A protein has these predicted regions:
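Juxtamembrane intracellular "pre-TM" segments in multi-pass secondary transporters
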Residues: 162-194, 218
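Central cavity-lining transmembrane alpha-helices of secondary-active solute carriers
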Residues: 12-29, 232-245
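Extracytoplasmic gate region of multi-pass secondary transporters
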Residues: 186-243, 298, 302, 306, ...
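Cytoplasmic helix-loop-helix junction between adjacent transmembrane helices
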Residues: 67-106
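Helix-breaking motifs and short loop linkers at transmembrane-helix boundaries and internal kinks
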Residues: 3, 36, 57-63, 74, ...
């Protein structure tokens, strides 16, 4: 069939995720602030369903990349819409727990995506496909079935009604110059908040990309010896971190302390600094514990920041800011962090110093995130009423 090389597969997956994240997150965020979010979510869901179906019938690597981009646009944009909708379906003091549901759904979807696709692929490989899938390679047939399942999952959205927008300072139809002025007025808070979360994403992405080479080179493990438990560790600690983040955000609001909603992010970022030393642990067990703590802390900060944006910003800024977070974190975190580790490794003596370079970069960016979140907490505005 297509028989793409590893480089081609990396390009397809990378472009499919990065291009939508960087180019479309902000425009979709603006639409979230100004248009009917339920209809927008349905449209984005249809887009990712169409992309999944086109993946099954793509005749070339170029069209396969385009199909994966459609999936990326739909899935990335729908997260922004879901967070905005979730904020208006509940009171501010409940948003930590409400956002937790969205994040758990996202984590479960990613896990099911791997598990269900693998199961369908195995099923179509071991047994004869039904007539309407006959002649398709197993991976293509699996994507046809995934598209059908996705279409069925969209049906409940047809019964969802657009909620009234809460905490509005300017009309959703206000000129963009007014929205820009509102953003500028909050720059002293949003700047460090953006910097803190981008630094967390850099640390998490670098760890995710380079933990496998560290386990192979420094501990002599083969991929089949660690792939399963690393994946389970990242998923499990991500879920635990999301739960802790949601609870801490709601508790922080009740504290009446300025920026109390961000206290959980400050604490998690501080714990993440020593946890970033995981590549230097003397044993695999020690590495796993430190990596799990780091992953959990990243999940805490991610959820706390999402809640803070929906509580401390007026409704007409939320989609734009969430979209900007996704775009900037995607560009810097996914595009820059792995490369920075390789450059530092080269300066320290080459590939043999990968673990040391990863630890150094992780500690530095984790430290930056701690101070950035602390500054954002001190500059946090009052919740919008």
């Amino acid at each position: 069939e297509l028989a793409p090389s590893d480089d081609a597969l990396a390009l397809i997956q990378g472009l499919g995720a990065a291009v939508p994240m960087v180019l479309f997150s902000i425009p979709i965020g603006i639409l979230v602030d100004r248009r009917n979010r339920v209809r927008l979510t349905i449209g984005l869901a249809l887009l990712w369903t169409l992309g999944t179906l086109l993946t099954a019938f793509a005749p070339s690597a170029g069209l396969l990349t385009a199909a994966r981009m459609l999936v990326g646009i739909g899935s990335t944009g729908s997260l922004t819409a879901a967070l905005s909708l979730c904020a208006d379906f509940c009171a501010p003091e409940q948003r930590g727990r409400a956002m937790l549901i969205v994040n758990l759904g996202k984590a479960l979807g990613v896990a099911l995506g791997f598990a269900l696709t693998g199961w369908l692929f195995g099923l179509l490989t071991d047994f004869s496909a039904p007539g309407w899938l006959a002649g398709l390679a197993p991976w293509r047939g699996a994507h046809v079935l995934l598209a059908a399942i996705s279409a069925l999952c969209l049906l409940p959205l047809l019964f969802l009604r657009e909620p009234e927008r809460r905490e509005v300072e300017a009309s959703p139809d206000a000129p963009f110059r007014i929205v820009a002025a509102e953003l500028w007025a909050r720059r002293s808070f949003l700047g460090p908040l953006f910097a803190g979360q981008v630094a967390v994403v850099m640390a998490d992405v670098a760890a995710t990309v380079w933990v496998a080479p560290v386990l192979s080179r420094d501990f002599g493990l083969q991929p089949q010896q660690f792939a399963g438990w690393v994946g389970a560790l990242m998923f499990g600690t991500g879920v635990v971190g999301a739960v802790l983040g949601g609870i801490s955000a709601d508790m922080g609001q009740k504290s009446r302390r300025r920026g109390g909603i961000l206290l959980g992010a400050v604490i998690a970022a501080g714990i993440g600094v020593p946890a970033a030393l995981f590549p230097l642990m003397p044993s695999v067990t020690g590495l796993a514990v430190a990596l799990g703590v780091m992953s959990m802390c990243g999940a805490v900060t991610g959820l706390v920041v999402s809640v803070a944006l929906t509580v401390l910003l007026p409704n007409e800024l939320r989609g734009l800011c969430i979209g900007a977070f996704i775009a900037i974190a995607g560009l810097i975190g996914f595009g820059l962090a792995p490369w920075v580790v390789t450059r530092v490794s080269a300066l320290m003596g080459g590939e043999a110093m990968l673990a040391e370079a990863l630890a150094l970069v992780g500690v530095i960016v984790s430290g930056l995130s701690f101070f950035a979140f602390l500054l954002a907490m001190r500059r946090a505005p009052e919740p919008v009423r």
